[in-house]
Amino acid sequence: MASSARFSLVYRHIGREYLLSFLVAFFFFFFIFFINQILLIAQRILLKQVDYFSVLQLVLLSIPQFLLYTFPFSSLTASSMVIGDLSGNNEILAIRSSGISLKHVFIPIIIISLAFSMLTFLTADKALPWSTKKYRELYTDLMRDLPTLELMANSTNTIANTVMVNKGVEGNTVHDIILFETSSVRGGQILSAPKAEVSLYDLQSFIYQLELDNPLILKSETQGGWALSKAESAQFFLNFSGQIASIASALPSQLSIKELQQNIQEHKIALQAEKKRYQEKVQTLELSLAELVDKAKTDAEVSVSHIEELEVQLKQLKDQKPINFYYQYYRAELHKKYALSAACFMLVFLTFSLSFFRVKHGRLIGFGLSMLVAVVYWYLLFFAQMQIFSLSISPALLIWSPNLLMFFGGLLFLLHARRL
């Protein structure tokens, strides 16, 4: 009974300190990683004179995609700060002197980190897809009300078959505008105007009307000539349906587990068909090469260079094994959701070896070490994502490699520290 009470006291103390440190770390990472991007979103929308409530909604709906990294790094930092503080204040020494194993210090951290892993998984699988859908619906509604929402000042915008260059954008007014036509019907036509007003023309098709003031129209003729005309005003129509389509489609990282699995299955079938065609090409080329080699044994007129050419083609074909871009991409994003969720639990093992060292300012030292580990983990995960398109191996191995490296590295450090 007394032993159980001692463990309970340790669990409550460690758990409370871990949760408080997690809260501090969570707000730190939230502001460091995300407040700048949130302010950029708010600034971009506010400059378009969108109401404050809509801006607030967009900001809130953007938060779940940031939480996927906030939870793992906060869990790591909290564990590092707590264990560093306990070691620095000799609390670890006191616990060990009382005959309590260090595993009872680690148990509450592991259990709470597992809860954070589950919370991260729910964010990735439920909250992120839902918030993305609502974000795109709201943004689409704003585009209906404000046509220039997708038009940035001092920028170049491609809208359907039209390339638009403009300077200032104020409300529905666009200044110093130049329009380049790239369609086959009116290719080579250029329009310019000092000012233009954008207004909604067709709500269902997202077509907007551009009222040009004092436009100049330059048209290139097919025979090499050109024509220049001027008018007091002109009407031009912009088709924003392409922009709406891109907004309405979610990125693979914003899909749920179920949606990712469905897309993976579709692209797996496509990859299998591609591999079948690839094998047929290889077999056809090998057969042609074998026939040519057999023929060369009896026919001296067979060109040796032709045989060498086929051998080179066969070697190049075997080196270029088919890789389905989307099959790799969707599988990588699926495992990334699991890996980031598991990181809340796996990264804390790197901090356990700190319990065997007594350092001054242990909380600060732990915080600094966690920052270093977070940067290394971020880099490894980013590097692994870049390799999924160039390597034909399973994306699961690449995406999980940073987690496994950190986890087993933590176990090795812990075993080594115990022997010191």
At which residue positions do the language-model features occur?
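Short, membrane-interfacial amphipathic segments enriched in basic
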Residues: 1-11, 45-53, 316-324
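Start (N-cap) of specific transmembrane helices in multi-pass transporter permeases
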Residues: 13, 17-21, 104-117, 125
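Non-transmembrane, extracytosolic/lumenal segments of membrane-associated proteins
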Residues: 53, 57, 113-237
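Short helix-to-coil transition segments within interhelical loops
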Residues: 96-101, 391
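Membrane-proximal, non-transmembrane alpha-helical segments
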Residues: 290-334
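Transmembrane alpha-helical segments that form the functional core of multipass membrane systems
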Residues: 322-416
